[in-house]
Amino acid sequence: NLESFTNGAPGTGISSGTGTVFKSSVQRVGGIIKTSLLIDLTGLASSTTDLDIIGVGAGAAYLGQITAAKNGTILTGRMTCLEVPAGGADDVDLYAATEANGVFDAGIGTLAETALVTAAGAWTLGLTKGLSAIPAANQYLYLCGGEAGTAATYTAGKFLIQLEGYEA
């Protein structure tokens, strides 16, 4: 059984990026639920401040919401670099937050947040990093710049985020 991720599209701070691609799927097999998110950062931007949210404009810049009904109880996950980020910050982190109102250029720390993947340096092609924490049900996923000083629009950068859980 294949479905799309969450109850709708990502926030407009992601979906309105020129050239930005966001695709998702949720696969249920025998009580195991696999959620996959594919994002091309092209057209989104990073700011000059470490841990600011990646996106565009003033709209919410979340990738989507994790729910137990749709994505199950998450047990593990990973983030894989499919194309090295260029233009914007090449140190990209994944966070979860309880709020859906995080916007581009705002600090993720202004939300009730949890770091899921902290790159701690530039991503390289094929690099995979496991989740250091598990997103709770009803949290929203955000990408953040993991370094200061790179205020620019992305011209490249593709990631696959995979979450695995079970039916609650």
Enumerate the language-model features and the residues they cover.
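Surface-exposed, low-hydrophobicity beta-strand/loop segments enriched in small/polar/acidic residues
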Residues: 1-168
